[in-house]
Amino acid sequence: NIVNRGISGDTTFGVLARLEEIYYYKPTGLFLLIGINDIFNTNSPNRESITPLSVANNIISIAESIHKNSSKTRVHIQTTLPINSRLYKELTGTFPIHAIPLQDQIKQINSIIKKKSSQNHYTVIDLHDIFLDSDELLSREYTSDGVHLNEEGYLRWSNFISNYISFTTS
């Protein structure tokens, strides 16, 4: 059985608030792709506290909470996807609070998740790198707006994680 709990525009804070739903279902596997909206969310009242470290720590907290409350669930954290600021003009700058380019924030989040994976109960699926073009941006082949995947992007994603899905359900 597959249950999609993805919510458009969701943040790590939203997922943390809804973990009881996951505990209820006790899934065999869980594929987590979250974090980009945290760094996009400039309207958050806690914007100053949202950093790559805090986003990565929230993602890890989600995985660890699921393991603690549903120990048979295999948690797979998918790395945050790159963006293409040439296509999505609003992404060309940085957030004024953190003078770190968005692409670098994404890389920092992914780096922290990867480094801490051996100490925690999750597998990392590195999606970020398979979507990069030669300029280290989200390839135009996989997006029409620089942020969201298009049909080709979803096909690449599903093909890449299919082995993890097979492993999780066996």
Annotate each language-model stretch with its function.
Residues 1-11:
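A short beta-strand-loop structural module common to alpha/beta enzyme folds
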Residues 16-170:
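Alpha-helical cap/lid subdomain in secreted, periplasmic
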